[in-house]
Regions:
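Conserved ABC transporter NBD signature motif
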Residues: 5-20
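Hydrophobic anchor residue at the start of the ABC signature
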Residues: 26, 88
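Signature (C-motif/LSGGQ) region and adjacent switch/coupling loops
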Residues: 39, 71-74
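Short helical segment in ABC ATPase nucleotide-binding domains corresponding to the A-loop/adjacent helical element
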Residues: 39-47, 55
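Conserved ABC ATPase "signature" region
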Residues: 52-70, 122
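Conserved signature/switch motifs of ABC ATPase nucleotide-binding domains
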Residues: 73-76, 94
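Catalytic Walker B motif of ABC-type/P-loop ATPase nucleotide-binding domains
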Residues: 99-102
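Helical segment within the ABC ATPase nucleotide-binding domain
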Residues: 113-127
């Protein structure tokens, strides 16, 4: 993690697995290096790990991100959606075990946000890893979350946790707009309202 744990344990990989787990983060402000080109930003995690075949892996990632032909541009010359895709690609190129995302789509308009939510699902099919996604958008949580954790007011605590019955990891299936999607969205909205009102929620897993 970025900060040392105050209490508790976090397990990543089985006890038989060797090596330190690799974690990556996509920040809310993306934290792209403005003095590096698109290709330079993608290559940096691999250079820090002293990986081989960096140029080829960067080319492959550029194709996945639909950024081919832009590899020599700097982040300031990209559109908002292109910068978002670059940040995701830089995080995934090192093949992390866990990818943390801190509201990466919050500054985007609704249409672009939905496009990138779908794009993230496509990336996850090709780069399977555990993803922890922080959001204040209920619809985004219902669309992306296999499990959803609701945090209470400060000091933060887990107010509720459960499996999302509406979740599918198939990027070709868009559940948004279905009755089942709206049903889960309403339940989550009611849970958020209850927590804000100071009501206690029972921790569940799937209920």
């Amino acid at each position: 993690g970025v900060l040392p744990a105050v209490a508790g344990d976090v397990s990543c990989r089985s006890s038989e697995s060797a090596g330190k787990p690799v974690n990556a983060i996509v920040w809310q402000n993306l934290a792209l290096f403005p003095w590096l080109t698109v290709a330079g930003n993608l290559a940096l995690p691999l250079k820090l790990k002293k990986e081989y075949g960096i140029a080829e892996r960067v080319r492959e990632m550029l194709a996945e991100l639909e950024l081919e032909g832009l590899e020599r541009r700097f982040p300031a010359a990209l559109s908002g959606g292109q910068r978002q895709r670059l940040a995701l690609g830089r995080a995934l190129i090192a093949k992390p075990d866990v990818l943390f995302m801190d509201e990466p789509f919050s500054a985007l308009d609704a249409v672009l946000r939905e496009h990138l939510q779908h794009f993230l699902k496509q990336l996850r099919e090709r780069h399977p890893c555990t993803m922890v996604f922080v959001t204040h958008d209920i619809g985004e949580a219902v669309y992306l979350g296999q499990h959803i954790m609701l945090l209470g007011a400060r000091p933060s605590r887990v107010a509720a946790f459960g499996a999302n019955p509406n979740f599918t990891d198939n990027a070709n299936v868009d559940v948004r707009g279905t009755d089942a999607f709206y049903a889960v969205q309403r339940r989550l909205h009611n849970a958020v309202a209850a927590v804000r009102a100071g009501q206690e929620l029972h921790l569940t897993d799937g209920a």
